[in-house]
Every structure is written in structure tokens, then in C-alpha cells.
Amino acid sequence: MKPENKSPVLDLISAGMKTVVNTLQPDLPPWPATGTIAEQRQYYTLERRFWNAGAPEMATRAYMVPTKYGQVETRLFCPQPDSPATLFYLHGGGFILGNLDTHDRIMRVLASYSQCTVIGIDYTLSPEARFPQAIEEIVAACCYFHQQAEDYQINMSRIGFAGDSAGAMLALASALWLRDKQIDCGKIAGVLLWYGLYGLRDSVTRRLLGGVWDGLTQQDLQMYEEAYLSNDADRESPYYCLFNNDLTREVPPCFIAGAEFDPLLDDSRLLYQTLAAHQQPCEFKLYPGTLHAFLHYSRMMKTADEALRDGAQFFTAQL
């Protein structure tokens, strides 16, 4: 679609979202659009520091977890000693960016609202790691903490997965992987999915929306996919195109959050409609006036805080 035909998104977003978009960080250099992935990762980490400030304080612990690919860093957020469940968080960033620091506030707020232990998994990024390595690392971390739950003093009898954007895909893919391969890591009580991509290759929202403001043009999405997948056949894998998996049975309860002006919104809508059509427990909530990645901005934006609270409440209601 010609760029001129796209929706005038920046004119339509909410006042709170406009405040975020217009918030300048004077000490921050321009985004290195033509830089290396390493430079873009460094910039992303620096840019997120401002938005992570003032997060809830709580006990945190860091552990390296063994996987067949090597050690993977994890970070535990413990809001109380007697947690009712453990929630594994997978950060977004198009599979190529992000880490435990860039999503620190999101995990802390989620832990605070749910009063559950939250474990962030710093899966290996692409293109260094190709599908399905990230999923296998996540599953390995779940198995490790399930086996060592007593030593780490965490409750692994009930677990959940949560993620934003690419992390939402990884969250649901990991839950389906455990189901399909009959791996016991505790009862999966729920999956929390904020503005994820789940396998659509084209849609109305992908055509109408997306631009330099969110890094989700058709070209951007293609670049993320090419970095993540090992080959063309992976596009149809039931752990990448999740609509090719069996969504008619034993899908854990899903909280599906959509951003109104997100090119990936139709992915969330289709996931919800598919699950609902087959009586799988799910809830869909649309957050008006928001852009993709709005969850990061709870320091300034009430809607972001609300979306985290909604997800936490959905999860605790399943326990």
C-alpha cells in the first residue's frame, strides 16, 4: 500500500499516547537506523532506562539456567514469600532486540499486581539464534525451575506465560509446545498476551497501520521474520504460525490485549475469535488510542498501567 493511503495514526492516537510520543530524552542520540544490530540493541537499552524508572521495589534474584544451547540468564521478581503461582515473562523486540533490563518495569508491575513470582527469561536473540531455539530455551528454563522449585523457594505447581509483541508469540508457542510434547512443568493456569503476532502474513491492520513511529512497516515485519526463522518452511510451523496449531483443545486460558493502532491487531482479533469459536477460555480487550508497545509507558500513561493490571487480574482469577 502507498504510504499516503495509510491511516493518519499520529493524528488519531489518544492524548496520553501523544504525550509519550512527544516526550524527548535530550541526552539520547538519534536512533541508529543504519547501524548494526549491536548498536540498535545498545540504543534500545539506553532509551528504555527512562521508561523503567520508578518501578515497584521487591526482592530480585538472578540465575543462569542450563540449556542444550548454553546458559540462559533469568531474573526472578518476588513480591511476597508465599507466591500463589509463577509467571514466566518473555520480552518483545521483534526477536532481535530487548533483554531483561528493557522490560524491567513491565515485569515488576506485573509481579506487584499479581503478587506472583515473575521470572524473566533472557532467551537468545536472532539472528544469532534461529527458530525454534528461543522456544526450546524457554521450555528448558521452565523445566529447570520446576525441578529446582524447592531449592529456589518458588511455587511451580501453577504457572503461566506472559509476553508482549514477539514475546507474546513466544509465550503462547511455549505453552503449546509443553502441551503437544506432554512436558510437565506445573499446571498452566493462564497465558497473558499483549499485542502479539501469531502467524498472519497479511491483514487489514497490517495494510492500514504501521510506520516509522512503531517500526512495524511491512518491510520491518519481513526483516524480523527473516532474522528469526531458519528457512521458508518454518513460516508454516505450528509454533510460528500458531493458527496452524490445534487451537480447539486444551489451550490454557488466554488474556489477549490489542492496541487500537497496532498493525498486528488483526492477529489478536483472529486468535480471540478462533479460541472463542471452539469454547477455549479467553478474553479480549482493546485499548483505545494506543500504539504497539504502549505497555512500556506505565510511568506516564494510565492505559499502560491499566493493561498490566488487567492481565494480572485475569491470571490471578484462574488460580
Curated annotation (Swiss-Prot):
Enzyme class: hydrolase
Location of the motif Involved in the stabilization of the negatively charged intermediate by the formation of the oxyanion hole: 91-93
Subcellular location, principal: cytoplasm
UniProt keyword annotations, A-Z: Cytoplasm, Hydrolase, Serine esterase
EC number(s) recorded for this UniProt protein: 3.1.1.-
Subunit structure: Homodimer. Interacts with MalT and MelA.
Residues at the active site: 165, 262, 292
Gene3D superfamilies: alpha/beta hydrolase
Hydrolase among keywords: yes
GO cellular component: cytoplasm
UniProt GO molecular function: carboxylic ester hydrolase activity
InterPro entries linked: AB_hydrolase_3, AB_hydrolase_fold, Acetyl_esterase, GDXG_lipolytic_enzyme, Lipase_GDXG_HIS_AS, Lipase_GDXG_put_SER_AS
NCBIfam families, A to Z: PRK10162.1
Family in the record: Belongs to the 'GDXG' lipolytic enzyme family.
Function: Displays esterase activity towards short chain fatty esters (acyl chain length of up to 8 carbons). Able to hydrolyze triacetylglycerol (triacetin) and tributyrylglycerol (tributyrin), but not trioleylglycerol (triolein) or cholesterol oleate. Negatively regulates MalT activity by antagonizing maltotriose binding. Inhibits MelA galactosidase activity.
Protein name as it appears in the record: Acetyl esterase
Cellular compartment(s): Cytoplasm
